Amino acid sequence: MVDAGGVENITQLPQELPQMMAAAADGLGSIAIDTTQLNMSVTDPTAWATAMNNLGMVPVGLPGQQLVSDSICVPGFDPSLNMMTGITPINPMIPGLGLVPPPPPTEVAVVKEIIHCKSCTLFPQNPNLPPPSTRERPPGCKTVFVGGLPENATEEIIQEVFEQCGDITAIRKSKKNFCHIRFAEEFMVDKAIYLSGYRMRLGSSTDKKDSGRLHVDFAQARDDFYEWECKQRMRAREERHRRKLEEDRLRPPSPPAIMHYSEHEAALLAEKLKDDSKFSEAITVLLSWIERGEVNRRSANQFYSMVQSANSHVRRLMNEKATHEQEMEEAKENFKNALTGILTQFEQIVAVFNASTRQKAWDHFSKAQRKNIDIWRKHSEELRNAQSEQLMGIRREEEMEMSDDENCDSPTKKMRVDESALAAQAYALKEENDSLRWQLDAYRNEVELLKQEKEQLFRTEENLTKDQQLQFLQQTMQGMQQQLLTIQEELNNKKSELEQAKEEQSHTQALLKVLQEQLKGTKELVETNGHSHEDSNEINVLTVALVNQDRENNIEKRSQGLKSEKEALLIGIISTFLHVHPFGANIEYLWSYMQQLDSKISANEIEMLLMRLPRMFKQEFTGVGATLEKRWKLCAFEGIKTT
């Protein structure tokens, strides 16, 4: 029989749910619930399946009839396993496993099939339509809401359809074509949700009251939430118990119990106090007995003998301390000697680098090799200085220890000095040796400073020579650039002269053709008039005059006379300057002289002016290679003679 009143509190749950959640959060683990009242066990397979379903895990091996395939629905639990296959134990107290419900399962695209029952048939929805929506799953949900039922559907038909999903504990049907179904376990709800979207038809009837589209969704129920809270508390108790067992297992063992005082135990303890290997254990027992108040008149002599045995270990401990101090001093001395040897080798390496940077060897290295040597030298000097500072610090510490020993008035020191005079002499020699070492280090530092100053002076001289060479090379490059510019200008002038000569040639050829035609005409006239000889002479004279006139015009065009009175003044000054310098002067010399008279004039203007007057000034080149120099000379007197 199905209990129809098992889910009567479903609609009342939303009002009381916040109070229940707060009580569960505040009292989780502190509320003691008897497991007999819950009717569940740790080894119960259904309880384990429900717990794993709450955690979002998939149980395996559900026996009985299966509504859909295992890939779609959550499978059940195998009672013969008593544990979840392939799943390690999970801590339910970790974040996300408290009162927060697990995330909804991911949807899988599945082709649903027609389900045939005795009283009805379920037809799947169109696979192209989106899957039916569901609300957020409440924690510990075992109850589902089923809507869209046919009007003629009865509780027996509903039970026939949904009992394939699992054991049903209660069904509550409403008059408005919906009902609430409560299952025995939580994973059965997932199988019921699978039927959402199916169209239900009773028998073979086509009546509207005998068909309806099912909508299955999660429902909130007070009983489900209460059982879920109980399970959470049970898991919390199990986790606390497991954690306590783990802490007890990892806790360090307790110290061994100290036996009670007796004369026999006191005799054994006295023997242990005399043994060096068992002294630590025995002294602990002796301390405990004294603190307990075991000392009385009867046991005072025994305790005194044990305290005397403990005191006898003081001498042994002092001897061990002296041995360890001696070993430490030897280790310090070995370290200091090794550090001194390392510092000596550093000095030699730095000396090699300094010798390599001298002029005799330095000039033979390439630029990259010089750079590497300089880097290595700086690195070696830094390491050498660091090692030297470390050694000096060790010596300062030794001197401070010596001064402390001198100021100390310990009786052991006095006894040592009184016992042997040789120790005092050795101490004096050691002080003298240290002072000599200090002086030697000071001399070395002075030598290093002098070397560094010398290297700095040497580098400054090298830098000066390099700067001078660089300036000379820059001047040479500027001269070469200026020569290149002048050569380009001369080339342009030659090209213009060549074009002018071509124009003159074409012009003279045209004149010759005209004169030849005139000559032919005059010959015809001479034949008629008889004055051929005289007229031909006149024509030749006319031709020569025209050619000479054309040449003079071309020379005037080429020379391009002076444009202004300032240019004439400049030509006069330059002519006077070059007349005083018969071997010529370069353009820089001319420009420096002219700039004293006119600060606005440039060297390019002077050079262009000289190039425009080739009969007055000429250009000559002197020197070879880097010493090549261009000079201007005055040739006006020679030009007058040639004309």
Swiss-Prot record:
InterPro entries: ENOX, ENOX1/2_dom, ENOX_RRM, Nucleotide-bd_a/b_plait_sf, RBD_domain_sf, RRM_dom. GO terms for biological process: ultradian rhythm. Residues 142-221 form the RRM domain. Expressed in lymphocyte cells, breast and breast cancer (at protein level). Found in the sera of cancer patients with a wide variety of cancers including breast, prostate, lung and ovarian cancers, leukemias, and lymphomas. Found also in the serum of healthy volunteers or patients with disorders other than cancer. Probably shed into serum by cancer cells. Its cofactor is Cu cation. Pfam families: ENOX1 (PF23267), RRM_1 (PF00076). Its EC number is 1.-.-.-. Keywords: Biological rhythms, Cell membrane, Coiled coil, Copper, Electron transport, Membrane, NAD, Oxidoreductase, Secreted, Transport. GO terms for molecular function: NADH dehydrogenase activity; protein disulfide isomerase activity; RNA binding. GO terms for cellular component: external side of plasma membrane; extracellular region; plasma membrane. Not inhibited by the antitumor sulfonylurea LY181984, the vabilloid capsaicin, and retinoids. Transmembrane segments: none annotated. CDD domains: RRM_ENOX. It is found in: Cell membrane; Secreted, Extracellular space. It comes from the Eukaryota. Residues 307-342, 425-570 form a coiled coil. Its main location: membrane. Probably acts as a terminal oxidase of plasma electron transport from cytosolic NAD(P)H via hydroquinones to acceptors at the cell surface. Hydroquinone oxidase activity alternates with a protein disulfide-thiol interchange/oxidoreductase activity which may control physical membrane displacements associated with vesicle budding or cell enlargement. The activities oscillate with a period length of 24 minutes and play a role in control of the ultradian cellular biological clock. Belongs to the ENOX family. This is Ecto-NOX disulfide-thiol exchanger 1. The gene is ENOX1.
